[in-house]
């Protein structure tokens, strides 16, 4: 097992070194969600509706923004790695699919850590939310798990694209169901049965279930099934990604 982990961390170190030189990618990953969250604040503030409980929406929307941007940026970067034949060279040098995928996931998870923290702090500050530290830490955990799953989805989807242009059709296919079928906008119960079934195939549904419980005064284990579904979902996607990863055609 030691050579396996050594190769995984070797991939992670290479990707981290590459990220250090890609200031544009880091800037987009960190600043774009900050800007979108501010627009979200302006939107809710402009509604000026005392009957609207913004607290029930802002964290699910924040988590969705992290999900969307993480998926898009990671997928594009990974396809670029394929175009430049970086993946091909790693496979030629003896790296296995799972080692490559875990290495990329570890490296990009460091960025997801900062991104999720920024979104959490900004939402709490702008909307003047007064949750306990334990609740905020739980919200952060859910957002971070969703970001990691988004990266796993991006790795999986990038396996079916040979250039950046081929990624774009996957963006609405993967991300839009999470907005409309997760309970973030309207309650799941009012959707048709087929839509309720379909909602279980998007990770945003499980994240939203847990976030709603947390912002309503509950704790992580009030929605334990949804919480445990997040790492399970990520595991399944990683397995699929490892089986479909290939070198450049």
Write out the residue ranges for each language-model feature.
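Hydrophobic alpha-helical transmembrane segments of polytopic membrane proteins
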Residues: 138-161, 179-182, 232-240
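Terminal transmembrane helical anchor/hairpin motif
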Residues: 184-227
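Transmembrane helix-boundary elements of multi-pass transport/secretion proteins
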Residues: 3-87, 98-116, 127-136, 166-169, ...
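Hydrophobic/aromatic residues in alpha-helical transmembrane segments
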Residues: 39-40, 70-74, 118, 122, ...
């Amino acid at each position: 097992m030691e050579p396996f982990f050594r190769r995984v961390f070797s991939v992670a170190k290479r990707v981290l070194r590459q990220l250090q030189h890609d200031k544009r990618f880091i800037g987009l990953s960190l600043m774009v969600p900050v800007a979108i969250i501010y627009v979200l604040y302006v939107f809710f503030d402009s509604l000026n509706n005392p009957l609207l409980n913004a607290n029930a929406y802002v964290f699910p929307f924040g988590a969705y923004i992290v999900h969307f941007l993480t998926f898009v940026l990671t997928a594009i970067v990974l396809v670029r790695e394929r175009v430049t034949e970086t993946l091909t060279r790693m496979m030629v040098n003896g790296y296995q699919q799972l080692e490559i995928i875990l290495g990329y996931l570890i490296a990009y998870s460091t960025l997801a850590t900062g991104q999720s923290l920024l979104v959490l702090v900004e939402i709490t500050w702008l909307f003047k939310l007064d949750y306990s530290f334990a609740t905020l830490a739980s919200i952060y955990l859910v957002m971070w798990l969703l970001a990691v799953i988004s990266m796993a989805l991006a790795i999986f989807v990038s396996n079916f694209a040979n250039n950046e242009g081929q990624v774009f059709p996957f963006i609405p296919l993967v991300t839009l169901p999470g907005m409309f079928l997760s309970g973030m906008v309207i309650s799941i119960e009012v959707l048709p049965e087929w839509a309720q079934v379909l909602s279980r195939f998007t990770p945003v549904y499980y994240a939203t279930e847990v976030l709603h419980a947390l912002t309503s005064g509950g704790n992580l284990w009030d929605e334990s099934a949804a919480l445990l579904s997040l790492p399970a979902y990520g595991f399944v996607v990683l397995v699929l990604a490892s089986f479909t990863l290939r070198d450049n055609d």
